[in-house]
Amino acid sequence: MDPETCPCPTGGSCTCSDKCKCKGCKCTNCKKSCCSCCPAGCEKCAKDCVCKGEEGAKAEAEKCSCCQ
């Protein structure tokens, strides 16, 4: 997947950072970082959210800085 493209499979458009890979993005509008760790219903997902931890970590919601 092209990090430059950063598609959102479930809708909307992502404007991601250079290193964004946007895997499984559920955000409607992602800014700076497109968070695969954000749950679909996270209202703050589009607001400078940062994913913490490794892929496949326990609770994904706990990894997402915008969903605390």
Swiss-Prot record:
GO terms for cellular component: astrocyte end-foot; axon; cytosol; dendritic spine; extracellular space; inclusion body; microtubule; mitochondrial outer membrane. Residues 31-68 are annotated as: Alpha. The modification N-acetylmethionine is found at residue 1. A divalent metal cation 2 binds at residues 8, 14, 16, 27. A divalent metal cation 6 binds at residues 38, 42, 45, 67. A divalent metal cation 7 binds at residues 51, 64, 66-67. The keyword Secreted does not apply. One of its GO terms (molecular function) is zinc ion binding. The keyword Manganese does not apply. A divalent metal cation 1 binds at residues 6, 8, 22, 25. Disulfide bonds: none annotated. Residues 1-30 are annotated as: Beta. InterPro entries: Metalthion_dom_sf (IPR017854), Metalthion_dom_sf_vert (IPR023587), Metalthion_vert (IPR000006), Metalthion_vert_metal_BS (IPR018064). A divalent metal cation 3 binds at residues 16, 20, 25, 30. A divalent metal cation 5 binds at residues 35, 37-38, 51. Binds heavy metals. Contains three zinc and three copper atoms per polypeptide chain and only a negligible amount of cadmium. Inhibits survival and neurite formation of cortical neurons in vitro. Belongs to the metallothionein superfamily. Type 1 family. This is Metallothionein-3. It comes from Mus musculus (Mouse).
